[in-house]
């Protein structure tokens, strides 16, 4: 189970809307309490691909985020990105690029701007997708 603060959800949502029509992206990190992962920090990164169909994180920003995680003793949990025109589920490309089965992938759908949908996923080595429980509080 993943827990995300409402304020951090709002940061992700605002960043995604600001970057429309392109996909937005970032990283998530936090602390573990048994099987629970508490997201303590979201990182808002530049999508250097500048497209609405896929993303690549700015490598300098990505490195700075990882350094910040280490400095603050946070565990890297995975990444997040938006789908401006498609549902909150991993695309075939998302599955193909999911190289680490131990991390979580958060996808924010903006298909309906009045009802954005954020979901968390696990993608295993065989590219099977399961929904991870995500609590926003």
Task: Label each PLM-derived region with a short phrase.
Residues 82:
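Short, well-ordered beta-to-alpha junction loops that form the rim of enzyme active sites
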Residues 79:
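Conserved, mostly hydrophobic/aromatic
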Residues 1-76, 85-137:
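Conserved beta-strand-loop surface patch within small alpha/beta domains used
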């Amino acid at each position: 189970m993943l827990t995300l603060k409402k304020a951090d959800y709002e940061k992700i949502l605002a960043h995604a809307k600001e970057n429309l029509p392109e996909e937005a992206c970032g990283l998530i990190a936090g602390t573990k309490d048994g099987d629970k992962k508490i997201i303590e920090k979201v990182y808002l990164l530049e999508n250097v691909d500048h497209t609405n169909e896929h993303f690549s994180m700015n490598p300098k920003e990505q490195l700075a985020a990882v350094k910040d995680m280490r400095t603050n003793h946070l565990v890297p949990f995975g990444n997040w990105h938006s789908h401006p025109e498609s549902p909150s589920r991993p695309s075939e490309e998302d599955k193909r690029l999911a190289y680490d089965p131990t991390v979580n992938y958060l996808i924010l759908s903006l298909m309906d701007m009045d009802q954005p949908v954020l979901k968390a996923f696990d993608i295993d080595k065989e590219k099977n997708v399961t929904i991870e429980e995500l609590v926003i509080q």
